[in-house]
Amino acid sequence: MSKELGIKVTLKAALTLDGKIATASGHSKWITGEAARHKVHELRNKNDAVLVGINTVIADDPELTVRGIENGNSPVRIVLDSMARIPENSRIFQNDGTPVIIATGNKALSRKWPNLPDLKILTSPTVTPEITWILSELHKLGLKSLLVEGGSFTYASFLKSGAVERLVLFIGPKIIGGQEALSWCGELGVNQLDQALQIDISSITAVGEDWLIDAKIK
């Protein structure tokens, strides 16, 4: 759990054997199979909130709801969107009663937001919302657990912040290759191996045709 802010942060990613989350053209559906995707819905059901960056919304248009889980509850849906670029027709705005939070920066574009009773806009005091600020705001709203689902830049931001407690990595039996294909984690500023993030692997299990690595950050 994030020591200062009281929120347990879990980072979940689905990647190929060579660590890619999309091809060079941006195609990403599906890297993993149905069993792994069902596990993702179980994870969402166990967390108070789920978070993605704006690039993931624009590329994949996710719903971020819980489906296929008996008596499941969809978490609060959060988008990091520094410049308020999220399209108004994004599926995340579907009014199903699940709260939506958009975290923007202080230089965000002036715009009209969808008229939804469960929509909340948080404006950061900085151009790009800092992870510690985001977690502090979520804690004020009573949220105690957060599932981070992408993308590459957002994963890196959370890992660099030191707030991530748990990693849940679904590995699909595919190889994309190439330098242009998107790697699952963005720049961490690691120049020497002794600067690399160290993890403790709790378990490696088969999930359908895929593998699930459950680990903690040291």
Regions found by a protein language model. Name each.
Residues 1-218:
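Enzymes that bind and transform nitrogen-containing heteroaromatic metabolites
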